[in-house]
């Protein structure tokens, strides 16, 4: 009587092992491919998010440059001696701060939030209590302020702040609410804003009102500014007349931190921003 053996033979086991290795190899290859795709997408997403935040903040400062809470036609009194901040607002609301051409940008403007006044002298203003209950919530001693109406503006420094009153120096030629060329209801007070945008290392930084720089985005490997003057169709890093600048082109290169196939993800961005005080 013949005995029949059942089960796997050596050859069958070897074939099964080879097939298993092939399946495992294919699965590992798919895993590696997915991992590389994830790293590439993650790096690109971070770059795009950094660029979005950077351009949003830079654009806000450039658009506001040269502007106040009042008319763009407002000017200090003709007999008033301009200080450095007033001169900057009038003649160079955007500039390169004397740095190497195209490497830095400085923008000056009034703050976005401005407050109405109900009374004024040549060295103080009384704020509208229906708009702000305590002036200390908005201003502090040493703040640079813009006082303006539809006809004039001045940049002053706060010397004292109480519940409803802000005192300042230097004194204005006349009380802002008795200007015969502008109604008292148009008088506003806001903080003066001076910002400097620059690159340090691989970071994009902003310094506000002379304070230490704060990093806005990392991975910024290149940053440049170019300016278009009124009546021109070209952009240049060295404009011949800062008062005539009406738009700024911001070029930025961002590089990710993750490597894919031994290469880092890098993208170039460019955006053009107009100065509202010069174009509206």
Where are these regions (language model features)?
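Short linear sequence signals and composition-biased patches located at protein termini or domain-edge surfaces
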Residues: 42-46, 50-100, 104, 111, ...
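Short, conserved, GDST-rich strand-edge loop motifs in beta-rich repeat architectures
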Residues: 176-186
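Acidic surface patches and DE-rich sequence motifs
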Residues: 4, 149, 229-230
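Autoprocessing Asn-cyclization modules and mimics
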Residues: 82-178
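Aliphatic-rich helix starts adjacent to a transmembrane/signal segment
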Residues: 2-59, 63-65, 261, 279-280
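Residue-level preference for short coil/turn positions at secondary-structure junctions
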Residues: 6, 141, 243-246
């Amino acid at each position: 009587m013949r005995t029949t053996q059942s089960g796997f033979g050596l050859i069958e086991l070897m074939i099964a092992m080879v097939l298993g290795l092939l399946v495992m190899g294919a699965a590992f290859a798919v895993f590696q491919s997915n991992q590389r795709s994830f790293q590439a997408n993650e790096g690109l997403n971070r770059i795009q998010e950094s660029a979005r935040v950077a351009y949003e903040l830079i654009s806000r400062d450039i658009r506001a440059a040269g502007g106040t809470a009042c008319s763009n036609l407002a000017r200090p009194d003709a007999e008033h001696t301009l200080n450095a901040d007033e001169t900057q607002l009038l003649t160079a609301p955007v500039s390169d701060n004397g740095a190497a051409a195209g490497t830095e940008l400085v923008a000056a403007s009034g703050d976005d939030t401005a407050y109405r006044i109900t009374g004024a002298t040549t060295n103080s203003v009384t704020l509208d209590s229906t708009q702000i209950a305590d002036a200390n919530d908005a201003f502090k001693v040493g703040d640079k302020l813009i006082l303006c109406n539809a006809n004039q503006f001045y940049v002053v420094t706060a010397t004292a702040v109480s519940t409803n009153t802000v005192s300042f120096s230097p004194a204005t030629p006349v009380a802002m609410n008795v200007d015969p060329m502008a109604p008292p209801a148009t008088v506003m007070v806001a903080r003066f804003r001076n910002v400097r945008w620059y690159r340090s290392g691989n970071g994009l930084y902003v310094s506000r009102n002379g304070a230490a720089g704060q990093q806005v985005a990392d991975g910024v490997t290149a940053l440049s500014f170019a300016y278009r003057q009124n009546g021109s169709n070209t952009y240049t890093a060295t404009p011949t007349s800062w008062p005539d600048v009406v738009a700024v082109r911001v070029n930025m290169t961002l590089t990710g931190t993750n490597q894919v196939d031994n290469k880092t993800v890098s993208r170039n961005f460019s955006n053009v921003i107009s100065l509202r005080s010069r174009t509206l």
